[in-house]
UniProtKB/Swiss-Prot annotation:
Domain of life: Eukaryota
Swiss-Prot/TrEMBL keywords: Antibiotic, Antimicrobial, Defensin, Disulfide bond, Secreted, Signal
GO biological process, one term: defense response to Gram-positive bacterium
Sequence similarity: Belongs to the beta-defensin family.
Signal sequence, renumbered to the chain: 1-20
Keyword field contains Signal: yes
Entries under InterPro entries matching the protein: Defensin_big_dom
One GO term describing the cellular component: extracellular region
PANTHER family: BETA-DEFENSIN 119
General function of this protein: Has antibacterial activity.
Record field: transmembrane: none
Disulfide bonds: 27-54, 34-48, 38-55
Name of the protein: Beta-defensin 119
Length: 83
């Protein structure tokens, strides 16, 4: 019984082991991921600090003009309209 408590104390005192996968570098306000090549469902947009493309999901829209216009993605044309 003492051996069991000793084993549990040692097990709880050890730091958790992280798998060998590298930490993913996030970009565009945590909407994208920096990768060497984007997946089929992602679009490359600009570049990250490590000179890899920032891969955004296809449904993310980026307005590079900085102002909202009268296009399909403007505030007035969004669905659903809240009154």
């Amino acid at each position: 019984m003492k051996f069991l408590f000793l084993f549990l104390a040692i097990l709880l005192a050890m730091e958790p082991v992280v798998s060998g996968r590298r930490h993913m570098l996030r970009c565009m306000g945590d909407l994208g991921i920096c990768r060497p090549a984007c997946r089929q469902s992602e679009e490359p947009y600009l570049y990250c600090r490590n000179y890899q493309p920032c891969c955004l999901p296809f449904y993310v829209r980026i307005d590079i003009s900085g102002k909202e216009g009268k296009n399909d993605w403007s505030r007035e044309n969004r669905w659903p309209k809240v009154s």
